Amino acid sequence: MKRFKNILYVADSSGIVLKAFHHAVDLAVRNDARLTVILAMERIPPYLTRLTPYLLQQARIEELEAALDKLIEWAASRMKIEAKIVEGKPFLEIVRDVLRNERDLVIKSTDHGDGAMDWLFTSTDMHLLRKCPCPVWLIKASEPAPIRRILACVDFNDPDSPDAATAETLNRMILEMAGALADVQGSECHIVHAWEAIGEQIMRSGHTAIDDEQTEAYIEQVRREHQGWLDRLLSQMRRWIGAETYDAVTPKTHMPKGNPSKVIPALARDLNIDLVVMGTVARTGVPGFLIGNTAESVLNRIRCSVLAVKPPDFVTPVSLED
């Protein structure tokens, strides 16, 4: 499946060929896509240096050009790459480039901690997750290549809710991307749907006339409804990505019961997942309501790379002008 045609890779000033750049080049080659490398530098206030602004700017540009040259040289035998240096707030300049050039994927390297706070998202990472209109792939520096295991997170939405169409579109995008990457990388493809029986805690509290048998029957009914929905979604996935691709990746489903922000990160750790594909939007069409509480909780608890997806009608609060 050739989904991506215009990829933007966010480089840093080191010039090191990171795993993220390997993935960017490989994906661009496989998709016959355009690949642009962008390096954003913050403006340095004049009062922080004794050098004239012009001399300092030239020194920094020369350093960044050398870093870009290393990346372009590494990839020269496989494809031609465009490169640019921009000055300003990095996330703003990256999102503006996406808007101006209609990018369909942003790839960036990130890093993790080793303690209880698993993710060490930079400020730029979080801004991109919240505000970039196209999918954002944040790649852990130690992620294996090729990717071994992918986890796609899908969510059930009440068909009568005003967000039902958006949820369906988002689920399709998530499954198509996960399926395509699993096919290309030869990865295991896992699909997770976390569910809860609303009202279970009250029913088990002993303060109602509902007995244990009725409670268990209710929970089982809810489980069957969610299982039926997930089964139907898999049938749709087969049509969306094609029977040949579907049979090649043979998705494995998981339906843990519990709070998604807890059970999804736990499952990702148990399965030793390398990449989580998930939606991040709480509401669409309203700038400012850009990332759901559950999504942010999941992002803060997982230890692997993330491909964050937003629906087509997402509206970024970033404008092309300051």
For every predicted segment, state its role.
Residues 3, 96-148, 266-318:
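Gly/Ser-rich helix-loop-strand patches that form or flank binding pockets
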Residues 40, 44-47, 51-65, 79-88, ...:
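Extreme N-terminal leader/targeting regions
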Residues 20, 64-67, 170, 174, ...:
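Hydrophobic alpha-helical membrane-association signature
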Residues 54-66, 213-229:
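A short acidic, glycine-rich active-site loop
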Residues 102, 106, 142-157, 188-192, ...:
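Conserved long hydrophobic alpha-helices within structured protein cores
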Residues 36-38, 82-86, 137, 190-192, ...:
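General small-molecule cofactor/ligand-binding pocket signal
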Residues 1-3, 16, 23-26, 73-108, ...:
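Structural beta-alpha unit
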Residues 1-54, 149-216, 243, 301, ...:
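Small/aliphatic-rich secondary-structure junction motif
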